[in-house]
């Protein structure tokens, strides 16, 4: 993705925020339905190691008992670009708290909407869309920090599905954001395409 450093960082932050918010809120919804145990899940091998400051936040997340602490921990997680070791446990603690605090849950929903609008804006900008490409069914968050954004393109009736994946690329040495991998995917109905091309 070609962008100036400031724009790249803003896009990266929007991706990171929406991924965090979606993951935490989904966890809270699962807890409310009894589909998620009280124990945190294990981390994936793709995550980067903890720094001492990250470890401090992981330790302090054991005591998220008010909204101030919730936002403090969440704001720290937003600084990273990809999930780090132990973060899934922190997210689980935040999900547990927000599931019991309706006002914090509502504020998180507002922030999630703002982050979504930022991400959608960048996607449309990259695709040079003038309204023909629309967001379809929102975003899907993968465990490794990747976002999948489903799209809809009205003029092409032979396009059955269309989506992009957004992958933050970081430097292994210090975890800083190097680039964002933007991949466009499209599925076509060849039968409809041939019929339209033939004027049928």
Swiss-Prot record:
Protein's UniProt name: Trans-acting factor C
Biological processes per GO annotation: plasmid partitioning
Sequence segments annotated as region (Disordered): 37-58
Domain of life: Eukaryota
Alphabetical keyword list: Plasmid, Plasmid partition
Composition skew (Low complexity), residue ranges: 37-53
Known function: Plasmid partition require REP1, REP2, and a cis-acting DNA sequence (known as STB).
């Amino acid at each position: 993705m070609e962008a100036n450093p400031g724009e790249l960082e803003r896009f990266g932050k929007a991706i990171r925020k929406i991924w965090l918010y979606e993951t935490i809120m989904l966890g809270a919804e699962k807890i409310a339905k009894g589909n998620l145990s009280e124990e945190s899940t294990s981390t994936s091998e793709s995550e980067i190691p903890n720094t001492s400051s990250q470890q401090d936040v992981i330790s302090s997340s054991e005591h998220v008992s008010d909204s101030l602490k919730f936002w403090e921990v969440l704001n720290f997680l937003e600084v990273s670009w990809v999930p780090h070791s132990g973060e899934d446990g922190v997210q689980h603690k935040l999900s547990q708290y927000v599931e019991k605090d309706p006002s914090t849950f509502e504020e998180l929903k507002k922030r999630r909407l703002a982050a979504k609008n930022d991400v959608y804006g960048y996607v449309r900008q990259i695709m040079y869309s003038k309204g023909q490409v629309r967001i379809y069914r929102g975003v899907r968050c993968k465990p490794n920090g990747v976002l999948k954004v489903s799209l809809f393109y009205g003029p092409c009736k032979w396009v059955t599905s269309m989506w992009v994946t957004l992958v933050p690329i970081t430097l292994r040495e210090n975890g800083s954001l190097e680039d964002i991998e933007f991949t466009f995917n499209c599925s076509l109905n060849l039968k409809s395409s041939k019929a339209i091309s033939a004027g049928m």
